[in-house]
Amino acid sequence: MDKKTIIGVVLMSLIFIGYMLYSSKQQAEYQQYLEQVQAEEVATAQANENNEAEQAQAEASAEQDAESAQEREQSIYGDYLAAARQAEAQKFTMSNDYLTVDFSTLGGVMSKITLDEYTKFAPKDERTEKVVLYDPSTAKFDLSFYIKQGLNNLPINTSEYVFTSEGVRREGDAQRLVMQLEVAAGAFLQYEYVLYDEKNPSRDYMLDFNIKLVNLSPIMAQQSTLGIEWANRTYQNERSFKTENMYTTLSYHLPGEESVEDLGMSEDSKSKQVQSEVNWVAFRQQFFSQAFIAHNNFAYSDMGFTTESKDSGFIKSYSARLGLPYNAQTTEYNFSFYCGPNKYAVLSDVVGPDGEKIAMERLIPLGGWLVGWFNRWIVIPVFDFLSKYIGSFGIIILILTILVKLLIFPLTYKSYLSTAKLRVIKPEMDALNEKYPREEDAMKKQQAMMNLYKKAGINPLGGCLPMLIQLPLLWALFRFFPVSIELRAQRFLWADDLSSYDSVLNLPFTIPFYGDHVSLFCLLMGAAMIGFSMFTYNQQSAQPQMAGMKFMMVYMMPVMMLFWFNDYASGLCYYYLLSQLITMIQMTAIRRFVDDDKIHAMMERNANKQKNKKKSKFQLRYEELMRQQEEMMRQQEKANGKRR
């Protein structure tokens, strides 16, 4: 064997031995991998078996828990109430020309109330969303009472149970929905709702609600009252949160009273307990109300509200806890819900079960005795009459303003005559001021002025009388315009809604005490006030009391009104604008027909008559009083001189 062959055999042997060693190592690693995979598969299979066993055990345990929970619930509430807690709720709807009411058998309640004739505020032609008074996400109605359970009493809250119902039935001009909650065999609680369709708003905005206790007396626990918890959160429906909140509150009526009580307006939160009987409770908004009326009165009421944040989309959250008198003989309670607009003609026709007045129209805050009387018997009837023939409420406000100005024109004429007389005798008044320049002579000057007025036939208050007469009227309209639903959503010129402010410019910032918008009607009213004030000041500057009042009268008051009225109803600003323009026209016309020379001649004749006229007892007493005051001042001056 040669050398090359030996080397080749050795190399081949080494390669073979190396390959065998490498292969055995790979085989060992592969075997280890297989054993690991098999172990993992065994572990996974065992885990799956364990999980399946645990799941089966959990399902069995859940079934046992459900069965035991159901058994416990049945043992606590009985078969009927336990089933009512688990049942699936149904929904029903009743509607007429004015409103749509949705119902849910969960709690047997109204779940939503929609006013079909009214929409929420929206810019220009986007006003399509209807006003919703009652929404399931915000509202609650719960009747609570106790039933016997062995030696204990079990509280029942109807909001936790699903009632049964056969649906809505129509009976003539009415739709009827009956829902009942079976408490025990043959014993049940029944709710009956009746919605009318009589084409009469005072009836069709009403929803009768009757509660019947059928064979419940044997299982009812001893209790003097049943409780109703009524709650709701009202949506913002108008443009201005500030104004709508100002007129949104909780109101209530005591039996036999002509007035309505409320918890105050613009409060952040307020609550009140009334331990006496209450006829009805209302969640009142600026233009709409939900009133819960008890035909036989509530035994007591515990009520309150809280104001929501400006950007929440809501105005206030209401709650009322109401008591129903109960004894073993009680089988039925009768109520009515009013869900509709704060419209005087509608609310004044809402009556009690015997046809008696229940003061629902007093929900509208028209003002106190004199102001409220003027609104109820003059302003509202005129508006209602004119609206039958005129479609534009801007024109109606113009006509109302003209009628008012014609009504008080005689007083305006006398006021101008009084001002003209003062202008004629101004030289004599200036002479008296020069004659009595000292403060000590104030009584003498006043007496001399009064004698001058008397001789000229001037009433010192003649110029103020028309304004004093107009004050109740101005205040009445100030109360009427922001709560008049007749003006709501009524357009005129550039104003989208005469019941709210007209914004011709929305500011990117807020001016303190003014707001974040510019009301054009308010600006025009302010300009008219400045013009009217300057006109009046020039006419009345002869009066001593007018001296030094120019800045306050001509400039300060209009600017203050500009800040005050920027957020008020555009219809109100429009009325005040018209009122001042018409008054200036009247005064200008009177001035053209009144001759100062004729007035002076008339005053001379009056002075001659006064010389021959016997003084009245009042005049004699007044002159005597003036002499006594003058004598007292003279003695006081002497005493002061001696002390010095």
Protein language model regions, located:
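Transmembrane alpha-helical segments that form the functional core of multipass membrane systems
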Residues: 362-435, 444, 450, 454, ...
